UniProtKB/Swiss-Prot annotation:
The chain crosses the membrane at residues 31-51, 65-85, 89-109, 144-164, 181-201, 215-235. It is found in: Cell inner membrane. Belongs to the CN hydrolase family. Apolipoprotein N-acyltransferase subfamily. It is a multi-pass membrane protein. Catalyzes the phospholipid dependent N-acylation of the N-terminal cysteine of apolipoprotein, the last step in lipoprotein maturation. It comes from Bordetella parapertussis (strain 12822 / ATCC BAA-587 / NCTC 13253). The active site is at residues 292, 366, 416. Its EC number is 2.3.1.269. Keywords: Acyltransferase, Cell inner membrane, Cell membrane, Membrane, Transferase, Transmembrane, Transmembrane helix. Residues 248-511 form the CN hydrolase domain. It holds the Pfam family LNT_N. It comes from the Bacteria. One of its GO terms (molecular function) is N-acyltransferase activity. This is Putative apolipoprotein N-acyltransferase.
């Protein structure tokens, strides 16, 4: 019998709840230091692995995995309360209930993973020592494959919400070396294997560590070592000269951003920041990037004088400007209207009429829209109306859109949480069917002001770092309230502005070319490995 079954009835739920809360701390260095995130994640998840694998039934394993994940998601996503209550105007009990309801739904995926692993790998404590050692390896592989498979499902079901995928806890661990090959889901597989291997070291029948069960842990260490070696390899090469960018962080308070009475104040702040002269010795920017919805109304609702002012900024600085703006357009030959969350690019020669009609040559329309925030799922109009979300029903952008050609570099934009979905970024990095080369730099524009100065900002930066590791492309992030940053092609933060402050970040970004295996094949290799383990490991064990 497992020690998990001994002691008072409340002990195991309390341990799982505490482990789940600790697990939430492993995503982004706040409040824990960066070096501790990966060990905390593996140790906390090992508690869930041990408890679920020693459950008396698959149903009990589901309950244990769900409880662990419920506490992990509830704490890790607490910042959703801020958006719903502080800025959405939802009553505190309803906002808290919203966070708990979402966490309960998301926790079903880990719960089902634990149930599947328990069903495929029943406890084997009564087996002979050699058989127990062999089965520990296969059990760890099966449990990891189940967990990673459900992480992937969480990324695609109902448009997907893969925030807090366990792979993100390892951006500073040796497992990050696997990112260019297997992506975040492959890293999740390896992290889950390490946790299950750690759980397998504990021989519950005697309460002592059994060295004969260390095989899986040894394999986990070998995989970490291989990841470190892979991390020394350069998967891309420089192209052209570094691009000089100015990233603008306006820090407009979310409660004021969509207030019509304060529209001019926000516009003036961004104009002033964009117009700042370069510091002594600092080259002029090739491009000024401003955040998502820096103009909080549709472009055709602004007078021509506003666009004249922006064109004047571009003229004085002798540069181009890219900004996030909601667009209202009527495509040629179409009878309907189109509303998109977009990024537009322009310079001093761009006619004002193009800006007012949304027909600029450089334009990106957001593809992966936020449910309830940017589009209304069927039957949920009442919820969106209750939150009073502005600009809440957009059309989707095309799957592949042209990059912005700036001074010999090609920039692929994404908006808000689109960088959470790695496969969606890949078409822009690959050569097009027309022979057009892929992008050399990625750029994210966001407005995270909805979440205050919370963990969401650090978690989002962590997500961006992993995207650069997967693709070996640098990424810059221009955000309203933070964290505005430049990340190099190895996932290192080269420069960043403090959250919650207005300012500009001048950076030189070296564009890169060449495709990593992940950039070429996406999640397919990781999914193939997960599928192979799900078929082979239980049979061999």
């Amino acid at each position: 019998m497992s020690p998990a079954g001994k002691g008072p009835a409340w002990r195991q739920p309390a341990i799982l709840a505490a482990a789940g809360a600790a697990h939430a701390l492993s995503f982004a260095p706040d409040p824990l230091p960066a070096w501790s995130l990966a060990p905390v994640q593996v140790i906390a998840l090992a508690v869930a692995a041990h408890a679920s694998l020693q459950a008396p039934s698959a149903r009990r394993a589901l309950a244990r995995g769900w409880l662990f994940a419920m506490f992990s998601f509830s704490l890790g996503l607490y910042w959703l309360y801020v958006s719903m209550h502080d800025y959405g105007g939802l009553a505190a009990p309803l906002a808290a209930a919203g966070v708990l309801a979402l966490s309960a739904f998301l926790a079903l995926f880990p719960g089902l993973a634990c149930a599947a692993a328990r069903w495929l790998c029943p406890p084997h404590w009564d087996a002979s020592p050699p058989a127990r050692a062999r089965r520990t390896l296969y059990t760890a592989a099966t449990w990891a494959a189940c967990w990673a498979a459900l992480e992937w499902l969480r990324a695609v079901v109902l448009t997907g919400f893969p925030w807090l995928n366990i792979g993100y806890a390892h951006v500073d661990s040796p497992l990050a070396g696997w990112a260019p090959l297997l992506g975040v889901h492959g890293m999740a597989l390896l992290a889950a294997f390490a946790a299950a291997a750690l759980a397998g070291l504990w021989q519950s029948a005697s309460g002592r560590i059994d060295s004969r069960q260390a095989l899986a842990a040894g394999v986990a260490l070998l995989l970490a070592g291989a990841g470190w070696l892979l991390g020394q390899f350069s998967w891309s090469r420089p192209e052209g000269k570094p691009l000089h960018l100015r990233l603008v962080q306006g820090n407009v308070e979310q409660s004021q951003k969509f207030d019509p009475a304060l529209l001019e104040t926000g516009l003036r702040r961004h104009l002033e920041l964009a117009s700042l002269p370069p510091r002594p010795g600092e080259p002029k920017p090739d491009l000024i990037i401003l955040p998502e919805t820096v103009l909080p109304v549709f472009q055709d609702q602004l007078p021509a004088s506003v666009w004249d002012a922006w064109i004047e900024v571009a003229r004085r600085a002798d540069t181009r400007i890219a900004m996030g703006v909601p667009l209202h357009t009527q495509p040629d030959g179409a009878t309907g209207h189109r509303y998109t969350n977009s990024v537009i690019g322009f310079d001093a020669s761009t006619p004002v009429e193009q800006l007012r009609t949304g027909t600029t040559a450089m334009r990106y329309d957001k593809q992966h829209l936020v449910p309830w925030g940017e589009y209304v799922p069927p039957g949920f109009r009442w919820f969106v109306d209750m939150l009073d979300i502005p600009l809440g029903d957009f059309d989707r952008g095309a799957a592949r859109q042209p990059s912005f050609d700036i001074a010999g570099q090609r920039i692929a934009f994404n908006i808000c949480y689109e960088d959470l979905f790695g496969p969606g970024l890949l078409p822009a990095l690959q050569d097009g069917p027309d022979g057009r080369p892929g992008a050399t730099i990625m750029a994210n524009v966001s407005n995270l002001g909805w979440f205050g100065n919370t963990w969401a900002l650090r978690q989002h930066l962590q997500i961006g770092r992993l995207r650069t590791m997967e693709t070996a492309r640098p990424m810059v992030a221009a955000t309203n309230t933070g964290i505005t940053a430049a990340i190099d092609a190895r996932g290192r933060v080269a420069a960043a502005l403090p959250a919650g402050r207005a300012g500009v970040l001048p950076v030189a970004v070296q564009g890169m070319t060449g495709l990593t295996p992940y950039a070429r094949f996406g999640d397919k290799p990781a999914l193939a490995l997960i599928g192979l383990l799900l078929i082979a490991a239980p049979a061999l064990g």
